[in-house]
Amino acid sequence: MITIDIVIGNICSLLAMITDSISSSQKTTKGVLLVQSISQFIYGFGTLLLKGYSGAVQNAVSILRNFVAIKQIESKVLEWALVLMGVVLGVYFNNLGLIGYLPVVANFQYTLAIFKFKDNERAVKISFAICIGLFTVFNVAILNFVGACSNFVVTVATVIMLIKKK
């Protein structure tokens, strides 16, 4: 049965997608991160409505990570603290069993890839495809159809690009 929370959660995903597209038109990294933070807030709100708490926690940690980047705070300790926070809070607030771990694993592996392979575009893109693929499954499970469709399209596009650029 479609409830008001499902409708509003999906509308939030649509608004967040629009905000994500606006972020790409920003002229500065600070502008991109600020608009992406707004997007993460909207995604997080929608994910909360859809009762995907471990995913909402990942959105909140992403906002904190962007804030640290906007303030240009360079600290490996802080970066790893944010990774640890995402894992611990994601596990703690997981209410969906194995499915609830998908956003935690997705963000964890993607963050590690960025730390370890930041100069290897292909490795980061492979990790991104895995991340978005995991979020596709999670979004289906929480009935976030808008998010699942957009994640699926991005995953397929990324995989096709990776295959073509072998």
Predicted regions and their residues:
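Alpha-helical membrane-protein topology signature
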Residues: M1-K166
